[in-house]
């Protein structure tokens, strides 16, 4: 079985792929101090609790946190006797090479998302990912990543507001009933929610103008469903887009062997 690992700035997600479907998906807070042994104990406990008899023999990793990759490699080598494929490393090939400025480093999660997006929905595509950052990644008709946009993430914006303004509380993002808030919490929630609706609409509109194409739009990330409530911002929300991309990239590299 394949162990797919997506390490983001906030959370690290582990999924077990049996060749046809994901048997389980778990997440843990990203911590560069967490050892391979700790990962193994955590994974083994979850596998036991869910009664999944997973004989992991392969692994693929995408990580936006370089310091975590070493211990994830050790986890795969020591406990699953496999050498993981790491997206972004020279040994990892992509179906279509990115078409960006020479020397540009593209986050592996963004590349993984575009591979999955193209596979599922074809080219001329915008992938919006609501993560620690809110990213917009553009795929051309051939399936190549050609660039995108990076904006502060929703929760990051809320945290920054709370940290910079002593009188403003930390609040959870939710869809407000109206734009005009009648208390401080409602005002913050309204500003963030409607602000990000406008952000998505504006950036998508500008990308379409620059590409002179209608461009399909898909969204992923934990907060994507919250912004998909009656606004027709997205053609589709894909909950496990990154994991699907990791599986596709792993299979593509196996086929090249």
Curated annotation (Swiss-Prot):
Kinase keyword on record: yes
Principal subcellular localisation of the protein: cytoplasm
GO-annotated biological processes: coenzyme A biosynthetic process
MF-aspect GO terms: ATP binding; metal ion binding; pantothenate kinase activity
Names of the cofactor(s): NH4(+); K(+)
Keywords: ATP-binding, Coenzyme A biosynthesis, Cytoplasm, Kinase, Metal-binding, Nucleotide-binding, Potassium, Transferase
Residues the record lists as binding substrate: 107-110, 184
Compartments where located: Cytoplasm
CDD domains documented for this protein: ASKHA_NBD_PanK-III (cd24015)
UniProt: K(+) binding residues: 129
Active site (catalytic residues): 109
Cofactor comment: A monovalent cation. Ammonium or potassium.
Catalysis performed (reactions): (R)-pantothenate + ATP = (R)-4'-phosphopantothenate + ADP + H(+)
Positions of ATP binding: 6-13, 132
An annotated GO cellular component: cytoplasm
InterPro entries (alphabetical): ATPase_NBD, Type_III_PanK
Pathway per the UniProt entry: Cofactor biosynthesis; coenzyme A biosynthesis; CoA from (R)-pantothenate: step 1/5
The protein's Enzyme Commission number: 2.7.1.33
Family: Belongs to the type III pantothenate kinase family.
Subunit structure: Homodimer.
Known role: Catalyzes the phosphorylation of pantothenate (Pan), the first step in CoA biosynthesis.
Family annotation (NCBIfam families): baf, PRK13318.1-2, PRK13318.1-6, PRK13321.1
UniProt protein name: Type III pantothenate kinase
Gene (name only): coaX
């Amino acid at each position: 079985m394949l162990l797919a690992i997506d390490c983001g700035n906030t959370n690290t997600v582990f999924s077990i792929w049996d060749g046809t479907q994901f048997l389980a998906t778990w997440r843990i807070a990203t911590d560069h101090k967490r050892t391979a042994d700790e990962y193994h104990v955590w994974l083994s406990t979850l596998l036991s609790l869910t009664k999944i008899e997973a004989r992991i023999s392969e692994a693929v990793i995408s990580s936006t946190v370089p310091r975590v990759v070493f211990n994830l490699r050790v986890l795969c080598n020591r406990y699953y006797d496999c050498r993981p494929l790491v997206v972004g490393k020279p040994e990892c090939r992509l179906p279509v090479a990115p078409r960006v400025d020479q020397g540009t480093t593209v986050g592996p999660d963004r590349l993984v998302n575009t591979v999955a997006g193209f596979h599922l929905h074809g080219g001329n595509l915008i992938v919006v990912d609501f993560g620690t950052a809110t990213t917009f990644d553009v795929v051309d008709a051939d399936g190549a990543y050609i660039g995108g946009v990076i904006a502060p993430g929703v929760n990051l914006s809320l945290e920054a507001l709370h940290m910079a303004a002593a009188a403003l509380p930390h609040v959870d993002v939710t869809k407000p009933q109206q734009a005009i808030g009648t208390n401080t919490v409602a005002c913050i929630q309204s500003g963030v929610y409607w602000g990000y609706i406008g952000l998505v609409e504006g950036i998508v509109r500008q990308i379409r103008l620059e590409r002179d194409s209608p461009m399909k739009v898909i969204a992923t990330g934990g907060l994507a469903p919250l912004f998909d409530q009656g606004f027709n911002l997205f053609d589709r929300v894909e909950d496990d887009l990154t994991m699907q991309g990791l599986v596709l990239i792993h299979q593509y590299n196996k086929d090249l062997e």
